[in-house]
């Protein structure tokens, strides 16, 4: 894929269309924010954020909230990203230590479902040392029910298992994964009809 930038761009648009619902419309950003950061601080780091659609949505819907919004991804992905006012793009491998310290939100959308637990723990543990006491990790993923799973979530679960040896996770599985990483879920916000949720996570 890195050798075919046009295909990379198409893949990014396809991934955005698969989950068209915008997280920030269902998450109380201002309530969670508390005291707003000043312009020199970081509001959100969008880890593995692709073309930055979710970061652009946050900036668009909260134009008066100060603080940097930074999208991190691999260089071959960012090469196809379109610039946006108020959103920065930075090359970063999420298996390496998080370089941005003290952000309010460290946001991961559809990152962890690509990986089995061992790699997910590695990804999350790169973030923890960068967190300030007021920082929160936001995990935007499918949380599948134990029974009555929507067909979209069931299909994605099988696809993740076949393609990446990974899975879509239940609430209990997410909780167990966070525990392995030294984290805990303190709040959760469900939205859309596919069991999508934002899990608010802090160190134990």
From Swiss-Prot:
Pfam families: Methyltransf_2 (PF00891)
One of the protein's GO biological processes: sterigmatocystin biosynthetic process
Active site as annotated: 113 (proton acceptor)
Segments crossing the lipid bilayer: none
Keywords, sorted A to Z: Methyltransferase, S-adenosyl-L-methionine, Transferase
Known catalytic reactions: 6-demethylsterigmatocystin + S-adenosyl-L-methionine = sterigmatocystin + S-adenosyl-L-homocysteine + H(+)
Binding annotation for S-adenosyl-L-methionine: 48-49, 73, 93-94, 109
GO molecular function: O-methyltransferase activity
Coiled coil stretches, renumbered: none
Disrupted gene: phenotype observed: Impairs the production of sterigmatocystin and leads to the accumulation of demethylsterigmatocystin.
Induction details: The genes forming the sterigmatocystin biosynthesis cluster are co-regulated and induced on oatmeal porridge or the fungal isolates were grown either on oatmeal porridge or in YEC medium (0.2% yeast extract, 5.0% corn steep liquor).
Pathway field: Mycotoxin biosynthesis; sterigmatocystin biosynthesis
EC number(s) per entry: 2.1.1.109
Main function: Norsolorinic acid reductase; part of the gene cluster that mediates the biosynthesis of sterigmatocystin (ST), a polyketide-derived furanocoumarin which is part of the most toxic and carcinogenic compounds among the known mycotoxins. The first step in the biosynthesis of sterigmatocystin is the production of hexanoate by the fatty acid synthase (FAS) units stcJ and stcK. The polyketide backbone is assembled by the non-reducing polyketide synthase stcA by condensation of the starter hexanoyl-CoA and 7 malonyl-CoA extender units followed by cyclization and release of norsolorinic acid.
Family: Belongs to the class I-like SAM-binding methyltransferase superfamily. Cation-independent O-methyltransferase family.
The name this protein goes by in its record: Demethylsterigmatocystin 6-O-methyltransferase stcP
Taxonomic source organism: Emericella nidulans (strain FGSC A4 / ATCC 38163 / CBS 112.46 / NRRL 194 / M139)
